[in-house]
A protein has these predicted regions:
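Non-transmembrane, aqueous-exposed alpha-helical and coiled segments at domain scale
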Residues: 1-375
Length: 375
């Protein structure tokens, strides 16, 4: 057996842990592409369903292929009665990410992936069902309403907003949700994606891989940054107060979520996109506080620490302007990143070897066992 190479760097920073044809992250200090397409171009001109098709099927769809794919997803939106009954038993104070993992896992019990030949069908089912899993639980546990899980909205983003608010979303809100889902769809070997690939390398089923990824995203160092950013932004009532508060947090060495990135060195290309849409939403509602506060924090972090906002920071205000409860921010991430997770599972399965690294032992030297009577 060849001697294992010791990898340096906490959290495997800077280490190449495998190959992928799905995305590039941080090339030349910035940039994000999905199968060669710049995410900024996709966010400007594509539908999320086109991007999902690109990631899952390998190429952008034709007009006919997109129509057929969207129609397929629309037909898969409803939830089985058994799953609805499970969701009704989950309390309102449950962690929404636990709701998503429970929903995914339970669906795998009643609609199992019988073999890998149906992996795309299973993914399409989850892609169609995840908005309803989130919203059915939320509306029942918080409002006492059993909602219809089927809408006539053509897009997944519009469908989610309709389920959440019980009415057709505005054209602007549907567009922003579409952009958001595209921006969060895929991001190379992040923690949750690598978790999914490790699970897939054991030849586990797709539901288990996605449930494992959701569990990884649940952690505050991976998912939840937009929720934490929203909670921080809401503390301040003016831009000046935000500047003073941010300086105080920096002086106390408090953790400020939504800034910097493990891979990007100069900027996060997703941020410039969602910031622009957040500004449009702010203008629509006549906001004079939330967006100026966000910009003040942004400016202060750059001036003091040369840290730029990542995709999560302005997503917080964008979601808030659309009336989305803060606790649902990360589950929306799940609805989007499912496409990337599943595509990585497909990729892992296509050229698989179980992921089993070695560890550098740093414990005590070998010693002789002492019977309990002599200890």
């Amino acid at each position: 057996m060849a001697e294992a190479k010791v990898l340096s760097g906490a959290g495997l920073r800077g280490q190449v842990a495998g190959q992928t044809a799905l995305s590039t992250v941080g090339q030349a200090g910035a940039g994000l592409t999905y199968r060669g397409y710049d995410v900024r171009e996709l966010a400007a001109d594509a539908q999320f369903e086109e991007v999902a098709y690109l990631l899952l099927y390998g190429e952008l769809p034709s007009k006919a292929e997109l129509a057929a794919y969207s129609a397929k997803l629309s037909k898969l939106r409803d939830l089985p009665q058994a799953l609805k009954e499970v969701l009704e038993r989950i309390p309102a104070d449950a962690h929404p990410m636990d709701v998503m993992s429970t929903g995914c896992s339970f669906l795998g019990n009643i609609e199992p992936e019988k073999d890998f030949s149906v992996q795309r069908d299973v993914t399409d089912r989850l892609l169609a069902a995840f908005p309803a899993i989130m919203c059915y639980w939320y509306r029942f546990s918080h409002d006492g309403k059993r909602i219809d899980c089927v809408t006539d909205e053509p897009s997944i983003g519009g469908h989610f907003l309709h389920l959440l608010h019980g009415k057709k979303p505005s054209e602007l809100h549907e567009k922003v949700m579409n952009v958001s889902l595209i921006l969060y769809a895929e991001h190379e070997f992040n923690a949750s994606t690598f978790t999914a690939r490790v699970c897939a390398s054991t030849l586990s089923d797709l539901y288990s891989c996605i449930t494992a990824a959701i569990g990884s995203l649940r952690g505050p160092l991976h998912g939840g940054a937009n929720e934490a950013a929203m909670e921080m932004i809401e503390r301040f009532s003016s831009a000046q107060e935000a500047i003073e508060g941010t300086l105080g947090m920096l002086e106390r060495k408090d953790k400020i979520m939504g800034f910097g990135h493990a891979i990007y060195k100069d900027s996060d290309p997703r941020n410039e996109v969602i910031k622009g849409w957040s500004k449009k939403l702010a203008d629509e509602v006549g906001d004079t506080t939330l967006f100026p506060v966000s910009e003040a924090i942004d400016k202060t972090m750059w001036e003091q620490k040369k840290l730029f906002p990542n995709a999560d920071f302005y997503h917080a205000s964008a979601y808030h302007f659309m009336g989305i409860p803060t606790k649902l921010f990360t589950p929306i991430f799940v609805c989007s990143r499912l496409t990337g997770w599943a595509a990585h599972v497909f990729e892992q399965r296509a050229n698989n070897r179980i992921i089993r690294p070695s560890a550098e032992y740093i414990g005590v030297e070998q010693r002789k066992f002492v019977p309990i009577e002599r200890r």
